[in-house]
Amino acid sequence: ICTYNGFKIAGDTLWYRPSSLVDWLYYSGQNDKNFILLDLSNRGKILKMNEDSIAWYNGLPNDLDLIVTHVPPIKNRENGKGNNCSYYTNVDTFKSKIWIYGHDHKENDYEQDGTRFISNPWGYNTRNYKIKTLTIKK
């Protein structure tokens, strides 16, 4: 957690947790496995990343202004493939007013349960994404 210009901010990967055989088979074809510079071919490492992320999140206070994660904390409404757990990591409550995430490359901006969710995808160099500037005020 850090404070910047009066904003309390936290960030993590919030890594997902493949659980079923279908999830693991789907995961094996994902770009995360092929392009992110981590050894994610080992199931134990993937599960540990998820456990570490959940422990981090559970230890956060409930009054953050901004959380930034790679993986979204809920299913992205714009992602038709989003039912697979490789696209989100469920959390029980949202501990910030604003949550910015990426991972699934589907841009959106909506509010749910008092938290504004913003997907600001950048993507791989094979796609022409534009950088979106966002101004957040208290």
Segments the model singles out, each with a brief description of its role:
Residues 3, 88, 92-96, 104-138:
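Binuclear metal-dependent phosphoesterase catalytic core
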Residues 10-76, 80-81:
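Active-site-proximal loop/helix segment associated with metal-binding centers of metalloenzymes
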Residues 80-88:
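Short, surface-exposed loop/helix-turn segments at secondary-structure junctions
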Residues 13-15, 70-71, 102-105, 121-124:
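Active-site metal-binding loops of divalent metal-dependent hydrolases
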Residues 10, 66, 98-100, 118:
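Hydrophobic/aromatic beta-strand patches that form the interior of the parallel beta-sheet core
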Residues 8, 33, 45-48, 75, ...:
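Context-gated lysine
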Residues 1-5, 63-65:
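Metallo-beta-lactamase
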